[in-house]
């Protein structure tokens, strides 16, 4: 009897570490997405005309906050990073507090809300980036990535990080929902995994 | 003892009906969003130039599949409608099958995946519609809703239905996650709510 409980404690300790690892990965993915997109800016000078033989130059800047979908992207990734940071702190330092049904339930619902948010932001930005890359001939919207290549490359990097965050958050959300069915007590890493009597 | 179990059966019967009602609402919201956007098309003729005094006319058509975000919107709303239809059928006709932990867990995870999908599609389409309505002066993308007002109105209607679907799916997902903590047996409406012994 004691042996099976020992194995339960061992596996639940291991699954908590995996969940903690996933949260750390998700935190770094969404935080880097928010930072890379938030700092994404490129300034370029183009020749826009000629007066006689003298070319007329104009300077243009591409910045993330020129596109509402990218502003939403930065805000949402920052919020989800904060959520994961909170959950990580809860798991590491919240060891003494009992992981009761209600606590697990709120973590599961919060995770679901955050995966909904990050998936909305990543997809809105992705479809907007697609228009920036390919344009839309029906709406006569020209592509911009032929003139602002660095800006688009950085944007693509932020999108990849954000979609990695979406996948990680889907796994984390499914895991925290599953924990409700077998509520193994996610012991904190500081407290030694107590053998369940 | 029997009285408290009777009240449990009564409340669980009621909560199942509410969940069923929410699913029916979500189903109609996402289905109408998919249909309205899928059929969204407007053809107009504009004067695009003059040769001498004779105006040159050209006919333009705005269709949902001219925009990848709207194609994603129609597909995602159709998928979430199908998911809800399946869950409704399961709840109505699946009465005899025991709602065990695993069944409730898979319903909760499926609901989470579907709210993630519908939120991605609704937000991607919303930000694209915003560009259609207001244009983007930085990218020099002109708005199109001044010329295709009906097309944009129908698109707005589909978006409102889809966001209603997102809110309903958030509530449904939270409810199906909460059911894992108090797994009241969601009895089917056909079988009379059996009194839990």
UniProtKB/Swiss-Prot annotation, chains A, B:
Membrane topology term: Multi-pass membrane protein
Principal localisation: membrane
Ranges in the topological domain labelled Extracellular: 39-69, 128-156
Transmembrane helix listed as a keyword: yes
GO cellular component terms listed in the entry, alphabetical order: plasma membrane
Signal sequence segment: none
Protein keywords: Acetylation, Cell membrane, Membrane, Transmembrane, Transmembrane helix
InterPro entries: CASP/CASPL, CASP_dom, CASPL
Cytoplasmic side: 2-17, 91-106, 178-197
Residues found modified as N-acetylalanine: 2
Pfam families, alphabetized: CASP_dom (PF04535)
Transmembrane feature ranges: 18-38, 70-90, 107-127, 157-177
Subcellular location as annotated: Cell membrane
Recorded family membership: Belongs to the Casparian strip membrane proteins (CASP) family.
Subunit structure: Homodimer and heterodimers.
Protein name: CASP-like protein 1B1
Organism: Arabidopsis thaliana
């Amino acid at each position: 009897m004691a042996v099976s409980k020992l194995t339960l404690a061992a596996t639940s300790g291991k699954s908590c570490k995996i969940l903690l690892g996933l949260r750390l990965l998700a935190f770094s993915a969404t935080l880097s997405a928010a930072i890379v997109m938030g700092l994404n800016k490129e300034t370029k000078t183009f020749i826009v005309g000629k007066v006689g033989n003298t070319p007329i130059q104009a300077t243009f800047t591409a910045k993330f906050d020129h596109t509402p979908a990218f502003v939403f992207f930065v805000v949402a990734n920052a919020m989800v990073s904060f959520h994961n940071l909170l959950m990580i702190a809860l798991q590491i330092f919240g060891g003494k507090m009992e992981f009761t049904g209600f606590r697990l339930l709120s973590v599961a619902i919060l995770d679901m809300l955050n995966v909904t948010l990050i998936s909305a932001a990543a997809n809105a930005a992705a479809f907007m980036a697609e228009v920036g890359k390919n344009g839309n001939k029906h709406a006569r919207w020209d592509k911009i990535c032929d003139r602002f290549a660095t800006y688009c490359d950085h944007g693509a990097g932020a999108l990849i990080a954000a979609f990695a965050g979406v996948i990680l958050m889907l796994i984390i959300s499914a895991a925290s929902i599953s924990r409700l069915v077998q509520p193994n007590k996610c012991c904190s890493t500081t407290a030694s995994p107590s053998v369940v009597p």
